[in-house]
């Protein structure tokens, strides 16, 4: 099991991860209530959230998340084709619908589980006003989504982007265009167009490679 520590909005989070389970450990003082029954709504069942169970004592609160088999990570996606990276970016935008739920969340890569088909599921979620993050709205979601998307295509980590680098770093033109957009729908539209373009290019390249291999095999067969 590996330990991952991150800080978001001034609060430290400790993730303990293995292939089948994630744990998030918080200090009891990080939860601004003595009524732990209020946290039961975090055990919600939703296709965009990992299944969760919870335990606590006088000092700590522990959340356990069940993982699907053969999950991926961001490093794996970054090594894949541009179209697959764009597909992940689009799937992150789909999490916008979770804003309608009575919980909050954040889009740090360590808090998002990527399934084998690149769907994205949220691990840690919070009760509004008594946990971090206290709230999340469309504007905040858009900012975090942009940070995640740029983290896919560059070496800039989510945290530094979120803390201010998002607005000042140099990025390729298509990412700069994404950065300037003012709504999730505009970002989705731009990414979708780029995704279709890259799929066509990659499909054409694959066809050329297959034809070249066939010709090579054909000529080799003649000389054998």
Residues of each region from the PLM?
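Conserved structural core of kinase catalytic domains
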Residues: 10-87
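Membrane-anchoring helices that localize proteins to membranes
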Residues: 216-224
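Short, hydrophobic/amphipathic alpha-helical packing segments
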Residues: 86-94
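Hydrophobic HxD+1 residue recognition
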Residues: 107
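Protein kinase catalytic-loop region centered on the HRD/HxD motif
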Residues: 93-102
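C-lobe/activation-segment region of protein kinase-like
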Residues: 6, 101-103, 115-217
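Hydrophobic residue at the +6 position relative to the catalytic HRD Asp in the kinase catalytic loop
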Residues: 110-112
């Amino acid at each position: 099991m590996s330990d991952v520590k991150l800080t978001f909005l001034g609060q430290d989070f400790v993730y303990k991860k293995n292939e089948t389970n994630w744990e998030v450990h918080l200090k009891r003082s990080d939860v601004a209530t003595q009524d732990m029954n209020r946290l039961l709504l975090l055990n919600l069942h939703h296709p965009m959230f990992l299944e969760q169970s919870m335990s606590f004592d006088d000092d700590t609160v522990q959340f356990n998340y069940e993982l699907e088999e053969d999950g991926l990570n961001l490093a794996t996606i970054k090594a894949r084709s541009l179209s697959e990276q764009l597909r992940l970016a689009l799937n992150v935008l789909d999490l916008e619908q979770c804003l309608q739920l009575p919980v909050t969340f954040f889009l740090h890569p360590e808090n998002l589980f990527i399934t084998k088909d690149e769907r994205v599921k949220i691990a840690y979620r919070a009760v509004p006003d008594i946990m971090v993050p206290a709230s999340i709205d469309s504007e905040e979601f858009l900012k975090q989504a942009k940070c995640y998307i740029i983290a896919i295509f560059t070496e800039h980590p989510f945290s530094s982007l979120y803390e201010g680098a998002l607005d000042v770093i140099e990025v390729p033109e298509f990412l700069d265009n994404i950065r300037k957009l003012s709504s999730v729908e505009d970002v989705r539209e731009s990414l979708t167009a780029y995704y279709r373009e890259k799929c066509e290019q990659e499909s054409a390249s694959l066809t050329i490679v297959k034809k070249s291999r066939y010709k090579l095999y054909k000529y080799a067969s003649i000389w054998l």
